[in-house]
Amino acid sequence: PHPYSSAASDVYKRQMKARVDTAVAQRYGRTDLILTYDNDQFFLNRPLLLDAGLDLDEVARFVAGVAETAPEVQRVLTAEELRPGAFFEGAEANVLRGWSAKMSGDVVVMLKPGFLEYGRTGTSHGSPYAYDTHVPFLIMGPGVPEGLTGMARTEIRDIAPTLSALIGFPRPSGCTGRPIEDLFYE
């Protein structure tokens, strides 16, 4: 199959899980330390790690090191790296914005640009790269300066606060973006 087809994606996902499962079994003598690999994330079996006296972050670093050897992988981030929130720009910052300490995996795999891990039912919410996160933004109407072009890059997360500011509504709860300033100054 074509390297970016859904069939290839299914193969990649199985191969990635098998690669890491094998290495974890060899290192730790157990095959049950990883619950699942889904949506480019490894979810570790936290209760089992605790019972076995294994350090979650150390096992996550080991899993990341193994996953990083796959040819499709650009970078691998552990929860330990993501928890401090140290990424402010680029693809890593996009990963961080979508990551939750309570809900996300313990190891996040960033695939190389152009590659998505998804099955036959469709694609994902996108990669963390600019070609997948850039949305052309066109706006017109009362309160919008006429003929304004060439604004700075617009982030998806800036659209809701911009529209809220234009119509005089409070920003939505949990909103992380900012109104697009060019629209409010002539």
Task: Label each PLM-derived region with a short phrase.
Residues 1, 27-30, 168:
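Glycine-centered secondary-structure boundary/capping sites
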Residues 68-72, 164-172, 185:
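Sec-exported extracytoplasmic/periplasmic mature domains
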Residues 179-186:
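C-terminal helix-and-tail extensions that cap enzymatic domains
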Residues 10-162:
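Active-site neighborhoods of enzymes that stabilize oxyanions during catalysis
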Residues 156-158, 165-179:
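Extracellular ligand-binding/catalytic regions of CAZymes and related secreted enzymes
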Residues 2, 150-153, 171:
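Short N-terminal micro-motifs specific to bacterial/archaeal maturation
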Residues 1-8, 12:
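Single conserved hydrophobic/aromatic residue that forms the stacking wall/gate
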